[in-house]
C-alpha cells in the first residue's frame, strides 16, 4: 500500500527516480533555474531545500553528504561557500515554482523552478 508517500513516483522505478532528481538538483544549483513538469518541480524542491540546508550547516559531514548526492564536486564547494551569505537569514523557502504554459506535445503542466 502507498500510504503517505513523501516523493511522487514520477512513473519510474526508485533508482531512475533518484538519478532524475539528482540530475535536476545538480542542474538547478548550477544554472539557478530549470524548466520541468510541475510534479517534478515539486519533488525537486524538497531535494534542493535539503542540499541548501546542508550547505548552511557547513560541517565536514554535511559537505560529504552533499558530495555524495550532487554530481559535480566543484559545484558542492561553491554552494557551501555562497550558501551562508545568500541564505543565512532564511529558515527555508529557497526555491520558487512558477507555472508556465503546458507542453506542446502532451499538454503536461510545466513549471519553472528557480532559486530565490
Swiss-Prot record:
Superkingdom assignment: Bacteria
Record flagged with keyword Acetylation: no
InterPro entries hit by this protein: Ribosomal_bL17 (IPR000456), Ribosomal_bL17_sf (IPR036373)
Ribosomal protein recorded as keyword: yes
Keywords linked to the UniProt accession: Ribonucleoprotein, Ribosomal protein
UniProt xrefs under SUPFAM superfamilies: Prokaryotic ribosomal protein L17
Biological process annotations from GO: translation
A GO CC term assigned to this protein in UniProt: cytosolic large ribosomal subunit
Entry's Gene Ontology molecular function annotations: structural constituent of ribosome
Family annotation (NCBIfam families): L17
Subunit structure: Part of the 50S ribosomal subunit. Contacts protein L32.
PANTHER family, per the entry: LARGE RIBOSOMAL SUBUNIT PROTEIN BL17M, RIBOSOMAL PROTEIN L17
Family: Belongs to the bacterial ribosomal protein bL17 family.
Name by which UniProt lists this protein: Large ribosomal subunit protein bL17
Biological source species: Prochlorococcus marinus (strain SARG / CCMP1375 / SS120)
